From Swiss-Prot:
Record Gene3D superfamilies: 6.10.140.1680, Winged helix-like DNA-binding domain superfamily/Winged helix DNA-binding domain (1.10.10.10)
Matching SMART domains: HTH_MARR
Species: Bacillus subtilis (strain 168)
Record-given protein name: Uncharacterized HTH-type transcriptional regulator YvnA
Lineage: Bacteria, Bacillati, Bacillota, Bacilli, Bacillales
Source species, domain of life: Bacteria
Gene name of the encoded protein: yvnA
Length: 157
């Protein structure tokens, strides 16, 4: 196989990774759609993608703690702690303990947290629609090749 295509693909992967990393660290402004004015100011803050994904995990799972979040989101426990601290500060989540186990803490969503989780889901649906538009630019065979590439790439990670 021609090495120039390897070089071109490597450059594309690097550019993708850089842009993706930059996007992960940027803040996400939650739109005001579907939020009453009394809740809008509270939820209008800029949230990191990590914070939003933590809210989503808590919304869809039970017995959520730092270890669970770190494992599920493939991030460090320190990153979880930092994001959780901000969510607690803004009354998006609360800490609970199980009877008989005063040491281990779990997270639950507040009413504001449930609203934020719903808004995050709406953002995911919007992103899926944008991806579908992109996918429509390619043939089925092209998409199968890209899918095979990503699945194999994951095995190398």
């Amino acid at each position: 196989m021609d090495n120039s295509i390897h070089d071109e693909l490597f450059q594309a992967i690097q550019q993708f990774a850089l842009k993706r990393d930059k996007r992960v660290w940027q803040k996400v402004q939650i739109p005001s759609i579907g939020i009453s004015s009394q809740h809008h100011d509270h939820l209008k803050k800029d949230w990191t993608l990590t914070q939003l994904h933590i809210v989503s995990c808590i919304h869809t799972s039970q017995n959520v703690n730092n270890s669970f979040l770190a494992s599920r989101l493939h991030i460090s426990k320190a990153a979880v702690s930092k994001a959780v601290h901000a969510l607690l500060k803004h009354n998006i989540i609360t800490v609970t303990k199980k009877p008989g186990n005063k040491k281990e803490i779990f997270y639950t969503l507040t009413d504001s947290g449930r609203k934020l989780a719903a808004l995050h889901e709406q953002l995911h649906e919007k992103a899926k629609e944008q991806y579908k538009q992109l996918f429509n630019e390619f043939s089925i065979d092209d998409l199968k090749t890209v899918t095979a590439f990503f699945n194999l790439w994951i095995k190398y990670m």
